[in-house]
From Swiss-Prot:
The gene is Gipr. Disulfide bonds join 43-67, 58-100, 81-115. Present in the pancreas as well as the gut, adipose tissue, heart, pituitary, and inner layers of the adrenal cortex, whereas it is not found in kidney, spleen, or liver. It is also expressed in several brain regions, including the cerebral cortex, hippocampus, and olfactory bulb. InterPro entries: GPCR_2, GPCR_2-like_7TM, GPCR_2_extracell_dom_sf, GPCR_2_extracellular_dom, GPCR_2_GIP_rcpt, GPCR_2_secretin-like, GPCR_2_secretin-like_CS. SMART domains: HormR. May form homodimers and heterodimers with GLP1R. This is a receptor for GIP. The activity of this receptor is mediated by G proteins which activate adenylyl cyclase. CDD domains: 7tmB1_GlucagonR-like. It holds the Pfam family 7tm_2. It comes from Rattus norvegicus. Belongs to the G-protein coupled receptor 2 family. Keywords: Cell membrane, Disulfide bond, G-protein coupled receptor, Glycoprotein, Membrane, Receptor, Signal, Transducer, Transmembrane, Transmembrane helix. This is Gastric inhibitory polypeptide receptor.
Length: 455
């Protein structure tokens, strides 16, 4: 028995050696750490034996990934891929790049794409293709939204009869959508392209544009936050119209302005401070420390949840109103469906679908499904809102019709020597709708003005 046991132990030991030889690249965590630690020691010894240059230069250092020698200011350093990588044999000919600034300080940017695991390149290329297509989609969506929102904002601003609290809130919402679209499109122009960087000029340009890129990132976060808060203002105001019997809008609009434009600063400013202190890397477009990202994400999720609850509450009110008025609205189910679809983009209800799915949970197909859903609807949301609440709005169409009739009266076109027949302004078919488009504080029956717009 002892001999058999000894032979078994020798066989297992030989098998382990064979596996270690055949799988030399499959290092354990402990082995990888030891190789990384030895690489750092060798780097430190090399730097101590090297005499620093006399001119302005970046100090030699080990940045926890690669060993950087002393480098002259305003140049790009290049070192071979670190040999402690498990796949070093496949990337031995690759290099890591880092920019030394004109002030003799290392830039936060580092390009190690040539040293990445080649086995992941295929999956990376597929993901890159999907992300590039999604970028094209939201670029088209935000550009279209930007154009239509600008036109809608001009229309609501020019016609004085459309000036009321409801449309003032719409105008601020349109502005927030425009700022969001403009900030995202501008940020994309300042961010580096997807995938590996080519050439030695890219780090220099990227380092020079770093401040502008981070500024654009901060403005983007503020504009996105303002967009969500103005969606919340729309929900709060609509709920106020339907529920509160005695309502006075004096002073309320100032509170709405403070909430819409002031609330985002309450979480964007702390995010900027914490990000600068604890994760001041690249253009701040990546959120490696999730706790910092939740400073912005938590208030946005709260606004989404509140708006969804308001949406459910409003639907309940509309159902009860429409059921009590079946004599006037016999097709109330169809009108309820139309009302629901109309309210969804105004309140951003679509955000609830993937709101419970966090960034940590979204992996693989779920991640791309979440990205595609949110990117498509969010980029075209401004376009839908401008169409639903401006271009096909009866009050807006009536004002445009009045303007056209007024212009026709000022510039008559005689036909066959016959004087043109004057058309009174009051003959417009939607004149009654305009007379009813008064500030909501003058309407004494709660919910009637909203219900009439759906019936």
């Amino acid at each position: 028995m002892p001999l058999r046991l000894l032979l078994l132990l020798l066989w297992l030991w030989g098998l382990s050696l064979q596996r270690a030889e055949t799988d030399s690249e499959g290092q354990t965590t402990g082995e990888l750490y030891q190789r990384w630690e030895r690489y750092g020691w060798e780097c430190q010894n090399t730097l101590e034996a090297t005499e620093p240059p006399s001119g302005l230069a970046c100090n030699g250092s080990f940045d926890m990934y690669a060993c950087w020698n002393y480098t002259a200011a305003n140049t790009t350093a290049r070192v071979s891929c670190p040999w402690y990588l498990p796949w070093y044999r496949q990337v031995a000919a690759g290099f890591v790049f880092r920019q030394c600034g004109s002030d003799g300080q290392w830039g936060s940017w580092r390009d190690h794409t040539q040293c990445e695991n080649p086995e992941k390149n295929g999956a990376f290329q597929d993901q890159k293709l999907i992300l590039e297509r999604l970028q094209v989609v939201y670029t088209v969506g935000y550009s279209l939204s930007l154009a239509t929102l600008l036109l809608a904002l001009l229309i609501l601003s020019l016609f004085r009869r459309l000036h009321c609290t409801r449309n003032y809130i719409h105008m601020n919402l349109f502005t927030s959508f425009m700022l969001r679209a403009g900030a995202i499109l501008t940020r994309d122009q300042l961010l580096p392209p997807l995938g590996p960087y080519t050439g030695n000029q890219t780090p220099t340009l990227w380092n020079q544009a770093l401040a502008a890129c981070r500024t654009a990132q901060i403005l983007t976060q503020y504009c996105v936050g303002a967009n969500y808060t103005w969606l919340l203002v729309e929900g709060v105001y609509l709920h106020h119209l339907l529920v509160v019997v005695r309502r006075s809008e004096k002073g309320h609009f100032r509170c709405y302005l403070l909430l819409g434009w002031g609330a985002p600063a309450l979480f964007v400013i702390p995010w900027v401070i914490v990000r600068y202190l604890y994760e001041n890397t690249q253009c701040w477009e990546r959120n490696e420390v999730k706790a910092i990202w939740w400073i912005i994400r938590t208030p946005i999720l709260i606004t989404i949840l509140i708006n969804f609850l308001i949406f459910i509450r409003i639907l309940g009110i509309l159902v009860s109103k429409l059921r009590t008025r079946q004599m006037r609205c016999p097709d109330y189910r169809l009108r309820l469906a139309r009302s629901t679809l109309t309210l969804m983009p105004l309140l951003g209800v679509h955000e609830v679908v993937f709101a419970p799915v966090t960034e940590e949970q979204a992996e693989g197909s779920l991640r791309f499904a979440k990205l595609a859903f949110e990117i498509f609807l969010s980029s075209f949301q401004g376009f839908l809102v401008s169409v639903l609440y401006c271009f096909i709005n009866k009050e807006v169409q009536s004002e445009i019709r009045r303007l056209r009739l007024s212009l026709q009266e000022q510039c008559p076109r005689p036909h066959l020597g016959q004087a043109p027949r004057a058309v009174p302004l009051s003959s417009a078919p939607q004149e009654a709708a305009i007379r009813n488009a008064l500030p909501s504080g003058m309407l004494h029956v709660p919910g009637d003005e909203v219900l009439e717009s759906y019936c």
